[in-house]
Amino acid sequence: MIARISKSDVWGSVDAPPSKSYTHRAIAIGSMGHYAKITGPLLSADTLATVSACRAFGADIRISGDTVEIAGVIGKPRVPEDVIDAKNSGTTLRLCSSIAALAEGATVFTGDSSLRKRPNGPLIKALNDLGAVCYSTRGTGTAPLIIHGVMKGGRISINGSISSQFISSLLISCPFAKNDTTILIEGELKSKPYVEVTLEMLEKAGCRIETNFEEFRIQCCQDYNLGEYRVPGDFSSASYPLAAAAVTGSRVTVGNLFPSKQGDAAILEHLLDMGANVFWDEEMGTVTVEGGRLHGIDIDAGQTPDLVPTLAVLAACAEGTTHINNAEHVRYKETDRLRAMATELRKMGVQIEERQDGLDIEGGRLTGATVDGHDDHRIVMALAVAGLAADGQTTISTAESVDISYPAFFADLGKLGAKVEV
């Protein structure tokens, strides 16, 4: 699908979609426990892949309107009858890999061409060290993966610098292992807030995990029960309409943004630091951004990788130079997001230098161009925001990928008055 964006002001209000990260975890934790009633989930391509995978493990999942009810497997997943296709969802693949390690038989995972390029080596090693048998069919650490249970627990170490999803995966499944588990983190734990989200939800479900974030200690033979759970709004998705207000000198309010463990709430601090006017009514769950005179800043993206495409566009529209640092792990997402943003913003006239772990961006005037969305929802949405600030028209390919996390994205832009054709 092609999207065409013309220079526009944006005014008004929209609600943030439900959090993709919380929804994935609610489905996985609900499926591994006794029962869950999840209200206000994000039902998108990615999260529905997790629903399908958990059904394959034996969870009874029923979707009705704005509610998902789950009768879980209580730590004893069955062996799937067929290959599990995680589609484009790295979260599905990684969270469910550890679930597969509890099944008394072999599970096969695959995914689309993008997912089959994403690294899983540290998780494969961890599952093997815990007593399961796990390997990549091509020996590359990428899907297709074959996983045979049952993991027993034990003491392992895992690299924390590639993806925090590896750690979240183990935290969800290791409470059901036959022995206690200790996980030692090697190097910096990148994207730590996502692990905090996992721990928050497991604690609500009654699971006991001790940690200082360098070491995780998990008691064996537990079970848990998520019960009733409401999914919060997604700050990652909200970053796009908020940034749209900032780069066009407009005013936008985004609702359904209450305080939570989401690290991507840091977008509000970054907007303030760059010169936008930001007001967050935490009780009402509304964030209002009014564009100001933006200027470049230095940003550490180590804990907020999903904000990098948005931050790159803000930087492109700001005066001076912005340095986005500590972001090498952003290369291992649906696409290499550092390279993708550098490549596409250059087409729009932006001076941008790509480093192994970041971007140096000189702000200036943007010109509409034909750009590639790289089949990546965050690249597409970030480029759409850039198109709102660019002279002329911007044409974006693979626009359908927004269905992964924000299906109503283009409709919401239109609601705010943007000139959008899809």
From Swiss-Prot:
One of its GO terms (cellular component) is cytoplasm. This is 3-phosphoshikimate 1-carboxyvinyltransferase. It comes from Methanocella arvoryzae (strain DSM 22066 / NBRC 105507 / MRE50). Keywords: Amino-acid biosynthesis, Aromatic amino acid biosynthesis, Cytoplasm, Transferase. Monomer. Pfam families: EPSP_synthase. Phosphoenolpyruvate binds at K20, G90, R118, Q165, R337, R378. Gene3D superfamilies: Enolpyruvate transferase domain (3.65.10.10). HAMAP family: EPSP_synth. The active site is at D306 (proton acceptor). PANTHER family: AROM/DEHYDROQUINATE SYNTHASE (PTHR21090), PENTAFUNCTIONAL AROM POLYPEPTIDE (PTHR21090:SF5). PROSITE patterns: EPSP_SYNTHASE_2. It is found in: Cytoplasm. The keyword Cytoplasm applies. GO terms for biological process: amino acid biosynthetic process; aromatic amino acid family biosynthetic process; chorismate biosynthetic process.
